[in-house]
């Protein structure tokens, strides 16, 4: 009988990937990023361990959505105080904080527990084409 090999935290290799969000559909891009963050693309994937890679996303302000979502999709946040609900459309959030759009889409695709929070910390999103992670030699993903 074969034994399942569980990787230890010392043996897990973490790579850095660079994803360009220019002219990409939001949901398809977020799915791809969430897969890399969880480590589901690796043969050593283990559901209860953080086996994922680091992902750098550039050109967040150039991400697209299909149909009328640009004018109809709403983003909600609450200050925690009575009457503190703020509602913002995709268009205005894209102008103000485009990084938050991708972060929120990916965060919803990760586990909703401490493991998901740990995996989410490996996502780095930047508005323009520049990023401060050149020393990590990220691999460009063409998809």
From Swiss-Prot:
Keywords: Ribonucleoprotein, Ribosomal protein. Pfam families: Ribosomal_L13. The keyword Cell inner membrane does not apply. Gene3D superfamilies: Ribosomal protein L13 (3.90.1180.10). GO terms for molecular function: mRNA binding; structural constituent of ribosome. The keyword Nucleus does not apply. One of its GO terms (biological process) is negative regulation of translation. Disulfide bonds: none annotated. InterPro entries: Ribosomal_uL13, Ribosomal_uL13_bac-type, Ribosomal_uL13_CS, Ribosomal_uL13_sf. SUPFAM superfamilies: Ribosomal protein L13 (SSF52161). It comes from the Bacteria. GO terms for cellular component: cytosolic large ribosomal subunit. Part of the 50S ribosomal subunit. Belongs to the universal ribosomal protein uL13 family. NCBIfam families: rplM_bact. PANTHER family: LARGE RIBOSOMAL SUBUNIT PROTEIN UL13M, RIBOSOMAL PROTEIN L13. This protein is one of the early assembly proteins of the 50S ribosomal subunit, although it is not seen to bind rRNA by itself. It is important during the early stages of 50S assembly. This is Large ribosomal subunit protein uL13. It comes from Prochlorococcus marinus (strain MIT 9215). The gene is rplM.
């Amino acid at each position: 009988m074969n034994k399942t090999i569980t990787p230890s935290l010392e043996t897990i290799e973490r790579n850095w990937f660079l994803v360009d969000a220019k002219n990409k559909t939001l949901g398809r891009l977020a799915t791809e990023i969430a897969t890399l963050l969880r480590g589901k693309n690796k043969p050593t994937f283990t559901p209860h361990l953080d086996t994922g890679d680091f992902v750098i996303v550039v050109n967040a302000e150039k991400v697209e959505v299909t149909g009328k979502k640009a004018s109809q999709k709403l983003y909600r946040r609450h200050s925690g105080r009575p009457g503190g609900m703020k509602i913002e459309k995709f268009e205005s959030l894209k102008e103000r904080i485009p990084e938050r759009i991708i972060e929120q889409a990916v965060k919803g695709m990760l586990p909703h527990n401490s493991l998901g929070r740990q995996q989410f910390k490996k996502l780095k999103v930047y508005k323009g084409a520049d990023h401060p992670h050149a020393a990590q030699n990220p691999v460009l993903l063409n998809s």
